[in-house]
Amino acid sequence: VSAGGEAKALSLLYTDAAVKGYRLFNIDESFEDVTNLYDINQHPNEVLTVDPVLYDALKKVSDANCREIYLGPLYASLENLCASNDDAAAAQFDPNRNDAAAEETAAVAAFTQNPDDISLELSGENQVCLHVSDAYQAYAAEMGYTAYLDFFWMKNAFLIDYLADTIRGEGYQLGIISSKDGFVRCLDETGEKEYRYPLYHLSGNEIQSYGTMTYEGPKSIVFFHAYQAGSPDAYRYYQYQDKTMCTPYLSAADGKDHTAASELIV
């Protein structure tokens, strides 16, 4: 196979996997060829058969007792906050600055914390049931919620893993797959090549380069940052005029952002 032919084959493989991943984790619309997260949200208390990729992702968060996946309504509010044109508009969605937003956040967090109100049942053979109590369904209908479940900031972590596993499964074992929000998978198992990952730090209002991390061999890397680091972050972060920053890392304990560091790499 020529280099051009191999590049074309890899491009098609990546594109097909990326399209499938986008559809599986989509919370806004349904697709004929897959049962996705949107379908699960629209059919609470029904058993659905999903793709193994989505089943595996749901099982991982469920096994880890990661209840942040149930904060779908609050992630939607955060996106509205971050899309605001000014502080006054943003504050309407901010539980730390608006009483109505605080009340809504507390209510969703209370539902999120209680497995009797919302939980996932994963019964094997890719069968999933999102259990939602009558009380939560009534509240969601009153508030106009469209998604109980949302991977939100975690989504690209699972997409990167899926893309990496798909590509490696076809024999491609050199190179890196990364997302602009800080998720990285290195495919190279040879250990013969050194890779570099640039590190940044927010100093005042300026994002500065402060070093480079080098590594070898297969790695999974996550670089969390508590500030907007480019246009893809536009709907995940908001900075008020007083420099207060809102980030996407909401806690299931109270539905609020408690980010304490400007960067974290794991």
Predicted feature locations:
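Mature catalytic core of soluble alpha/beta enzymes
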Residues: 1-266
